[in-house]
Amino acid sequence: LTSHSVTLVYMKSYMVQQKSKTALDQVKQYHEQTKHEFNRYARSLGYLDWANQPNPFRRFDGAPLIPLPHLTLDEDPLSPSYESLFHPHSIPSQPVTLNSLSRFFEYALSLTAWKAYNGTRWALRSNPSSGNLHPTEGYVFTRSLDELALEPGLYHYAPKEHGLEHRWALPPELAQSMLQGIPSEGFLVGLTSIHWREAWKYGERAFRYCQHDIGHAIGTLRIAAATLGWNLLVLS
């Protein structure tokens, strides 16, 4: 009984101590704990557990997959020049169709190549990632659009198949009300992180790398949008 009492008191004291810290204090503590020093690296696992390597591709059981058309060499309209991406309104805005949405994701989050070595095969993607671990997942939330052959709702982008998994179907009226304030021809893109994909290699620094990867994904999404004459606005 004494042992249990001591444990409970200790845990209670620890919890009170944690609650007394502000969110900023916790952030500072995390960064202090996980930073590299001039004379040493931050703590890490020290090895890679290959038997438990995370799956780099997320799929949802039972979710219908809508294939997206891949880009072709004679794609119309042709991809604009790199310089023109930095001149607002120089690229005509394309309607939101299945083809343009496909190009958007292919430029931003898709697979770009496969590599193989000693019997191991892995993919490269258009968005850079620390350790090529790719914790970032992309989603699109849309209402009924005149030229977009998709039901209103939430979709998950599956890069391996280059398709959209239908995750949540919504009545058109509800989808419209949920997207109030978004331009009539606009849609929402969401990004999430699977932290285990990073923690498997980088341990407690994984949260840092996940935020870094989100930044890379926002960058490629912004460039992909610009090639279509679209404007990407980061909400949160």
Give each language-model segment a name.
Residues H4-S236:
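N-terminal accessory segments that position/regulate proteins before the catalytic core
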